[in-house]
Amino acid sequence: MATVQMYTTRWCGYCVRAKTLLEARGIEFEEISLDDDLGFRRRLLDLTGGWTVPQILIDGRPIGGYTELWQLDRSGELERLAA
């Protein structure tokens, strides 16, 4: 099974949606909360190339945020990547 990591904040509605989607598909993930990281936007940009949350990585490969996750799910690609 792939390693899925998601960078989140508690105030982010799209983070909740992404977690719900992954849980509904039975995909385990590591949630990395950035609530106490004042420099989180710089950290995200360095790690993923994006500065918004959520930022999701599958096996270390940045896939983007909720919209990209949803698109992968709709196309069936998420299941393949997460296997």
Residue ranges and their predicted role:
Residues 33-51, 77, 81:
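Thioredoxin-like thiol-disulfide oxidoreductase module
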Residues 10, 36, 48, 70-73:
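Short coil/turn residues that cap or connect secondary-structure elements
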Residues 26-31, 62:
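Conserved beta-strand scaffold positions in the cores of enzyme catalytic domains, especially
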Residues 48-57, 67:
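Structural micro-motif
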Residues 17, 21, 25, 46-47, ...:
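Non-catalytic interaction surface on structured domains
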Residues 58-83:
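Non-catalytic, surface beta->alpha helical segment in thiol-disulfide oxidoreductase systems
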Residues 1-28:
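Local sequence-structure signature of Cys/Sec-based thiol-disulfide redox active-site neighborhoods
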Residues 13, 39, 64:
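Short alpha-helical
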